[in-house]
C-alpha cells in the first residue's frame, strides 16, 4: 500500500465469543472502526469523491458541501484533505464534541444547525448553499456512489470472509447506503441471505440511525432490498454497546450497539444461523456524551 485511501476497507470480521446465543447460531461483527478515519463512512466518502472526479464533476481546489450527523463528515474531511478539496460540513449542534473536533482537525469548515432543525434542517441548508453556488453538494442520501461503495467492497468482503456461509445481514439504517449496497451484492450470490434493517423505536434517539419522515427518506433506499426491519430502543442500543466493551473487548458507538442488539435477536430466533452485523465506528467518538459513564456500570446496566 502506498496511499491512505488504499487502507480503506478490508476490515476484520470477528466472532462474538461470550455474548452469542447457545442455539448453534454464530454472530460475526465487521469492524469498520478500523478504517483510517474511524468508521464505515470512509468507504462511501471515498466512492462519492472518486466517482465524481471520474465524471469530471469536481476537481481538487473545489468546495464540497455535505450534511452529516458525524461519521460521513469526518470521512469526507479526511478524503478532502488528502485530495486537496475545501470541505463545508453541516451538522446538528447536539452531536458529540469529538465529532466536531475531528472534522475541524482535518481542516473542514463546520456549520451547525440547531438540535430542533436536526438532520432535516442540515440537509435543507446544504441544498440551499449548493443552489446558491457555494460548492458541490455530494448528497450522501441520494447519491448512488454511496451504496456502490458497499456493493463493490463491503458485500464482497463479507461473502469472502464467511466463505459464503452468511445467512443473515444486519445493519443500522441512516443514509441506508450500507444496507442497500450489501443487499444488492448478496441478492446476486448463489444462496439467499436475509437482509435485516434497524431503525430506532418511536421516541428513541440513536446517533447514526434514523426513522426518516417520508419526505426525507433517502433516495438511494430501496425497500425491496430489505427483508425485515426491527425497531431498537435507545436503552437496548446503549446497554449492548457497553456490554460489547466489557465482555467482548469491542469498543464501539451507540448505533453499533443497536446493530448487535438486533443481530442477537435474529440469531436467537434462527438456530444455526450465521449472522453478520456492521460495527459502524469506535466508542471514543461518544465519550463526552456520558454513555460510558461510571454510573452505568456501577448500576450494572448492560452487564
Curated annotation (Swiss-Prot):
Pathway: Amino-acid biosynthesis; L-cysteine biosynthesis; L-cysteine from L-serine: step 2/2. Its EC number is 2.5.1.47. It catalyses: O-acetyl-L-serine + hydrogen sulfide = L-cysteine + acetate. Pyridoxal 5'-phosphate binds at residues 71, 174-178, 255. Pfam families: PALP. It is an enzyme of class 2 (transferase). Signal peptide: none annotated. The modification N6-(pyridoxal phosphate)lysine is found at residue 41. Its cofactor is pyridoxal 5'-phosphate. Keywords: Amino-acid biosynthesis, Cysteine biosynthesis, Pyridoxal phosphate, Transferase. One of its GO terms (molecular function) is protein homodimerization activity. InterPro entries: Cys_synth (IPR005856), Cys_Synth/Cystath_Beta-Synth (IPR050214), CysM (IPR005858), P-phosphate_BS (IPR001216), TrpB-like_PALP (IPR001926), TrpB-like_PALP_sf (IPR036052). GO terms for cellular component: cytoplasm. One of its GO terms (biological process) is iron-sulfur cluster assembly. The keyword Cell membrane does not apply. Belongs to the cysteine synthase/cystathionine beta-synthase family. Two cysteine synthase enzymes are found. Both catalyze the same reaction. Cysteine synthase B can also use thiosulfate in place of sulfide to give cysteine thiosulfonate as a product. Homodimer. This is Cysteine synthase B. It comes from Escherichia coli (strain K12). The lineage of its organism: Bacteria, Pseudomonadati, Pseudomonadota, Gammaproteobacteria, Enterobacterales. The gene is cysM.
Amino acid at each position: 500500500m502506498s496511499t491512505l485511501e488504499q487502507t480503506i476497507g478490508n476490515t476484520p470480521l470477528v466472532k462474538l465469543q461470550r455474548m452469542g446465543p447457545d442455539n448453534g447460531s454464530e454472530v460475526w461483527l465487521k469492524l469498520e472502526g478500523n478504517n483510517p478515519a474511524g468508521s464505515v463512512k470512509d468507504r462511501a466518502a471515498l466512492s462519492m469523491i472518486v466517482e465524481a472526479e471520474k465524471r469530471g464533476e469536481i476537481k481538487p481546489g473545489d468546495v464540497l458541501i455535505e450534511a452529516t450527523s458525524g461519521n460521513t463528515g469526518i470521512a469526507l474531511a479526511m478524503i478532502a484533505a488528502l485530495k486537496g478539496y475545501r470541505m463545508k460540513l453541516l451538522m446538528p449542534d447536539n452531536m458529540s464534541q469529538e465529532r466536531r473536533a475531528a472534522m475541524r482537525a482535518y481542516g473542514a469548515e463546520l456549520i451547525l444547525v440547531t438540535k430542533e432543525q436536526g438532520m432535516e434542517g442540515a440537509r435543507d441548508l446544504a441544498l440551499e448553499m449548493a443552489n446558491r453556488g457555494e460548492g458541490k453538494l455530494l448528497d450522501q442520501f441520494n447519491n448512488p456512489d454511496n451504496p456502490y461503495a458497499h456493493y463493490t467492497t463491503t458485500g464482497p468482503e463479507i461473502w469472502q470472509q464467511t466463505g459464503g456461509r452468511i445467512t443473515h445481514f444486519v445493519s443500522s439504517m441512516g443514509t441506508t447506503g450500507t444496507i442497500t449496497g450489501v443487499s444488492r451484492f448478496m441478492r446476486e450470490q448463489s444462496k439467499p441471505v436475509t437482509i435485516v434493517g434497524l431503525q430506532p423505536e418511536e421516541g428513541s434517539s440513536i446517533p447514526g440511525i434514523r426513522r426518516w419522515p417520508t419526505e426525507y427518506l433517502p433516495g438511494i433506499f430501496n425497500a425491496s432490498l430489505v427483508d425485515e426491519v426491527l425497531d431498537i430502543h435507545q436503552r437496548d442500543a446503549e446497554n449492548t454497546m457497553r456490554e460489547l466493551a466489557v465482555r467482548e473487548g469491542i469498543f464501539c458507538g451507540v448505533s453499533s450497539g443497536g446493530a448487535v442488539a438486533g443481530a442477537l435477536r435474529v440469531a436467537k430466533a434462527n438456530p444455526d444461523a450465521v449472522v453478520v452485523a456492521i460495527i459502524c465506528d469506535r466508542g471514543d467518538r461518544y465519550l463526552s456524551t456520558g454513555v460510558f459513564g461510571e454510573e452505568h456500570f456501577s448500576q450494572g446496566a448492560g452487564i
